[in-house]
């Protein structure tokens, strides 16, 4: 199963003083033939750390990193697994705006290039609209809409789910939808 799907948890408590490289290497566990890492395992770990921008932290302890750096390490661990399906819980959590856009754009490009499917739970609607070609809108666990952003992210659906007004517009620079939650007029 681990070869089929990789999971990025919302948070991970690491009780051992693992280095970044050691933690990312745990993503390769499902590929190990015996106890020792292969050259392919080391290559996959290095590539995943480079993609996630954490290669410079390889020998640092995971617990010494900032929350955003830890997030990128966990993304690298999921990528090192080389699964065909990535299940990502809040992949942009604790990342600043530029890191979030770069990471999500990189993941979307990788998905298109390598045929990897990505399912991501995201609360930042605008980040989702920036990179997702399909979105699912949930209301207390029930599916309210599934389809293209244009089909799903409509004013009334957003208002019903989040119980506030929204402005739904189109970015003139990139043509993508964006949403702005608004205080209801009094």
How does the language model describe each region?
Residues 86-90:
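Catalytic Walker B motif of ABC-type/P-loop ATPase nucleotide-binding domains
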Residues 101-114:
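Helical segment within the ABC ATPase nucleotide-binding domain
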Residues 146-147:
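ABC ATPase "signature
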Residues 61-65, 69:
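Conserved ABC ATPase signature
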Residues 25, 39-57, 82:
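Conserved ABC ATPase "signature" region
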Residues 161-186:
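ABC ATPase nucleotide-binding domains
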């Amino acid at each position: 199963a681990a070869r089929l799907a990789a999971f990025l948890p919302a948070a991970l408590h690491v009780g051992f003083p693992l280095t970044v490289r050691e933690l990312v290497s745990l993503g390769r566990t499902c590929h190990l033939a015996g106890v020792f890492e292969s050259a392919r395992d080391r290559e996959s770990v290095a590539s995943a750390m480079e993609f996630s921008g954490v290669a410079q932290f390889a020998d640092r302890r995971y617990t010494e990193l900032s929350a955003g750096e830890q997030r990128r390490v966990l993304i690298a661990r999921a990528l090192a697994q080389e699964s065909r399906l990535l299940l990502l819980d809040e992949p942009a959590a604790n990342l600043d705006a530029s890191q979030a856009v770069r990471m999500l754009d990189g993941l979307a490009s990788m998905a298109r290039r390598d045929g990897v499917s990505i399912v991501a739970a995201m609360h930042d609607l605008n980040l989702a609209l920036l990179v997702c070609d399909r979105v699912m809108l949930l209301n207390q666990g029930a599916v309210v809409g599934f389809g293209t952003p244009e089909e799903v992210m409509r004013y009334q659906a957003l208002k019903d789910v989040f119980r506030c007004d929204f402005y739904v517009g189109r970015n003139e620079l990139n043509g993508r939808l964006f949403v702005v939650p608004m205080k209801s007029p009094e």
